[in-house]
């Protein structure tokens, strides 16, 4: 839990202070993240191959959309795509590490449920990851891209279930994070719905 919280704090601070540089040098950041991931893959346990760092990036990506309008939201939203790509690189490393581990120790077909949910989350993440690169995104129609990225909510649910079903000492922490996000997202959608109703009423009366 401490590792995740510290990582989240550092990601937020770094993104707030260097948001312009992150956008400008995103390709190099992706390359650096990939190199770190490759090195991590060869090690027994690191914060990358154990999934902590990827999770931290995604928690920031999840919650930034729910912040009230402010300078911190403006800056973090400006690099949200970059943070999602970096988080995906680290999450992919975590997933591949445990898939290889399960094959090496012959328990791939006898693993706990959370293992397969984790694999499912990686499968859902892949199209989101690929289409987050601007060079790919530019080739996709805006509506199509938005519809595809609705899968991000499926991804969040799968990750939450994966972590909660592990039932380790961080169970309560994961429950608060993902349960809290679910409640906040529902409240945010309700707020937007109620704000849109008066506008629709005015349009109806005008017609």
Segments the model singles out, each with a brief description of its role:
Residues 1-207:
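Membrane-embedded alpha-helical bundles that constitute the cytochrome b-like, heme-associated redox core
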């Amino acid at each position: 839990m401490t590792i995740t919280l510290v990582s989240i704090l550092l990601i937020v601070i770094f993104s707030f202070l260097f948001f312009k540089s992150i956008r400008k040098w995103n390709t190099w950041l992706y390359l650096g993240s990939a190199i770190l991931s490759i090195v991590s893959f060869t090690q027994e346990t690191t914060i990358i191959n154990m999934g902590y760092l990827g999770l931290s990036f995604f928690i920031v990506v999840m919650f930034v959309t729910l912040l009230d309008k402010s300078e911190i939201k403006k800056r973090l939203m400006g690099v949200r795509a970059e943070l999602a790509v970096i988080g995906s690189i680290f999450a992919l490393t975590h997933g591949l590490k445990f898939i290889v581990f399960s094959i090496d120790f012959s328990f791939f077909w006898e693993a706990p449920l959370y293992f397969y949910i984790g694999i499912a989350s990686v499968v859902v993440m892949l199209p989101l990851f690929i289409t987050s690169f601007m060079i790919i995104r530019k080739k996709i129609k805006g509506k199509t891209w938005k519809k595809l990225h609705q899968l991000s909510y499926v991804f969040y649910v799968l990750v939450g279930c994966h972590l909660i079903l592990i039932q380790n000492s961080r169970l309560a922490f994961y429950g608060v994070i993902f349960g809290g996000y679910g409640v906040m997202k529902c409240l945010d959608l309700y707020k937007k719905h109620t704000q849109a109703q008066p506008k629709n009423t005015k349009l109806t009366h005008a017609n």
